[in-house]
Amino acid sequence: MKVEHRIGVQAPASVVWDIVYDLDRWPEWNPLYTRVAGAIRYGGTIKLQLALPGQAERELVATVIDWSPNEAVHWKTSLLAGLVRTIRYLEIEAMGETGCIFSNGEIFRGLLGPRIARQLRSSLRAGFEALGEAVRDRAEAHWRAQGGGATLDAR
């Protein structure tokens, strides 16, 4: 089972990537992950404080399984002795030189994965939406500050 949020960003994919890749600054703007430690590198461990709306915050330990500059980072988690396995992703799809789509979501696997996903679906969607909006707002502000084109406010 997959839960995902996608949002258009009026800034280049490289600007979005710079924000996603800079884990040290996530606590400044990221409503979903309020603390983070680690680095984006193959096989690297990332410790995350997950703050889903309507849920108690909890710490997750994830392993980076894939990343590609300006495009994506994927990590995996395993809970309940492997009964819940997830792949979490942040992906950037360039839509020209000054725009992109930012997607973030989670794929649930394992014996209890789909059940947990159904239980948390509304909180996950709200959290992923908040993260997407925060990435968009920060990227567009950075792009404007760098002299990038004005954004259209179609929200």
Model-assigned labels for residue ranges:
Residues 107-155:
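A conserved amphipathic terminal alpha-helix motif
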Residues 42-47:
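Short coil-to-beta transition motif at edge beta-strands of beta-rich domains
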Residues 1, 77, 116-120:
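Residue-level detector of alpha-helix boundaries and kinks
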Residues 1-41, 155:
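Hydrophobic ligand-binding cavity/cleft-lining segments
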Residues 27-28, 37, 53-101, 107-112, ...:
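Hydrophobic-ligand binding "helix-grip"
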Residues 7, 55, 126:
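A short glycine-/small-residue-rich loop at the edge of a beta-strand within enzyme catalytic domains
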